[in-house]
Amino acid sequence: MAKLPILSSKDVIKVLNHLGFEPAPKRGKGSHSAFVKKTEDKTRLVIVPHRDEIPRGTLLSIIEQMGLTKVEFIKSLKECR
């Protein structure tokens, strides 16, 4: 099984943009950003904390919110770098 790298919020946001997620409407000031992707049957909402290093457990939760597996996420990360 692929081991998740330690990433910053900027790296995660690059992957989200690469996969077609868009910033959600502003919800005020805060330490997190929200991204949305609408598909035919679902609307996915992904919350990303602003951090220099996102813990692996938090990153795994973000990947699940995106609807991806770890392998799919790592592949997308390599594609957008």
Set out the residue ranges of the language-model regions.
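Surface-exposed loop/turn and secondary-structure junction residues enriched for glycine/proline
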Residues: 4-10, 49-51, 57, 80
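A short, structured beta-strand/loop element
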Residues: 23-61
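Glycine-rich, flexible loop/turn motifs
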Residues: 3, 44, 73
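C-terminal structural segments of small proteins and small subunits
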Residues: 53-81
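N-terminal first-folded block
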Residues: 1-27, 40
